[in-house]
A protein has these predicted regions:
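Substrate-binding cleft of carbohydrate-active enzyme catalytic domains
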Residues: 14-33, 80
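An active-site-proximal structural segment forming one wall of the substrate-binding cleft
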Residues: 64-96, 150-153
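Aromatic-lined carbohydrate-recognition surfaces of secreted/lumenal glycan-active proteins
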Residues: 27-31, 35, 92-93, 113-149, ...
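Active-site-proximal loop/short-helix segments
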Residues: 42, 89-115
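Aromatic-lined carbohydrate-binding/catalytic grooves of carbohydrate-active enzymes
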Residues: 1-10
Length: 198
């Protein structure tokens, strides 16, 4: 594992296994392409780079993985498979999009963003154990700039979790919002701990 990647200890593993062994429906939320530590550690194999070969940084200084690189697919697939094999019912991909802030002209993209994301999602889904639900977080309104489209969401994911700032009206007509759309809380209640159920 690359340096800078944090892992939990034995008590974390025990606590997690207690939850996974319960009757709770469990969701593993994975940061997909916005990943500073892995981008820093695996620049040539997985990182989104500018045309001059330097790591791409968005306006917030975050580094990104390049979905078109095999190393990125291998890394995310390994994480998702491990979570599914541990017993998680659902894999939720967060940051499943291209960055839209930062110097876009510096990027050297190899192919159409939407095609790359669709190929990535389909390749990942094929590697997951049968019955594992694959979902995605909709952080921004779908656009050609970030590579996310309504068709991509409908064809590649079992559910779409919608962040407060995203426009869910961009989902395809006829999309079953009752079973395939989850509205995410924008903030934790002031009372402290909480559990979201449906």
């Amino acid at each position: 594992m690359p340096e800078g990647i944090l892992t939990g200890g034995l008590s974390t593993s025990r606590n997690l296994q207690t939850i996974l062994d319960s009757n709770c429906y469990t969701v593993a939320r994975l940061a997909c392409f916005c990943d500073n530590a892995f981008a820093d550690a695996q620049q040539e194999q997985a990182s989104l780079c500018a045309a001059d070969g330097t790591l791409y940084r968005d306006d917030s200084g975050r580094r990104w993985l390049d979905p078109s690189k095999p190393g990125t697919l291998r890394y995310i697939t390994d994480l998702a498979k491990e979570c599914a094999q541990m017993g998680f019912d659902e894999i939720l991909l967060d940051w499943f999009l291209y960055p839209i802030s930062g110097d876009q002209s510096a990027l050297e993209l190899r192919a159409d963003k939407t095609v790359v994301l669709k190929d990535f999602a389909q390749a990942l889904e094929k590697q997951l154990p049968e019955g594992t639900v694959l979902s995605v977080v909709l952080r921004e309104t779908p656009s050609a700039d970030n590579g996310v489209t309504a068709e991509l969401l409908a064809s590649c994911f079992d559910r779409v979790y919608v962040m407060p700032d995203a426009d869910a009206s961009a989902l395809p007509t006829g999309y079953d919002r009752a079973t395939r759309v989850v509205t995410m809380a924008g903030y934790a209640p002031e009372s402290g701990s909480y559990l979201v159920t449906q």
